[in-house]
């Protein structure tokens, strides 16, 4: 699947997943796509934890309980390391966003589905629990969880405004 097809087919899968395993080779491809994303001042401060099977994902799904986390056979957790700064600036949001989008496109191109889960990690209590669960070193913060798997049925897709209504050439 080329990049433009992956972009047009990608959607946020908020429903259940099939229990079919995702091969570790595919998870590594997805992770490497994320780590290939640009980072501010080349800080490369994005860290990933690959959760290759349901048994490992189960404790996290008790902290972050959604249809996706409860049924996905695999997931990737995305962290940034605040100890790594570029010229005194914090590029965490830009860095993890670029990595996440690359991974979502890789997920789609490999025939899987996922959803960008970030809202649970704004809560300090949840943040503390996940950092303990992953035995994360000091300075790391979890930002995103991508449950990954084959969708259990066709996922709902939100309609988008026509692109021609949202881009302009030279001026508005």
Which stretches of residues belong to each language-model region?
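Acidic, surface-exposed loops and disordered segments
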Residues: 1-172
């Amino acid at each position: 699947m080329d990049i433009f097809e992956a972009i047009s087919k990608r959607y946020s899968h908020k429903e259940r997943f099939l229990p079919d395993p995702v091969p570790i080779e595919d998870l590594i491809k997805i992770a490497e796509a994320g780590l290939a994303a640009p980072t501010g001042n080349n800080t490369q401060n994005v860290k990933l934890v690959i959760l290759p099977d349901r048994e490992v994902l189960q404790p996290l799904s008790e902290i972050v309980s959604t249809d996706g986390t409860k049924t996905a056979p695999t997931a990737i957790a995305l962290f940034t390391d605040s100890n790594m700064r570029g010229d005194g600036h914090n590029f965490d949001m830009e860095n993890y966003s670029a990595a996440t989008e690359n991974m979502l496109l890789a997920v789609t191109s490999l025939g899987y589905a996922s959803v960008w889960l970030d809202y649970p990690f704004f809560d300090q209590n949840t943040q503390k629990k996940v950092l303990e669960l992953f035995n994360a070193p000091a300075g790391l913060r979890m930002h995103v969880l991508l449950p990954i798997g084959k969708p259990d049925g066709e996922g709902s897709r939100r309609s988008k405004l026509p692109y021609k209504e949202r881009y302009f050439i030279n001026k508005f």
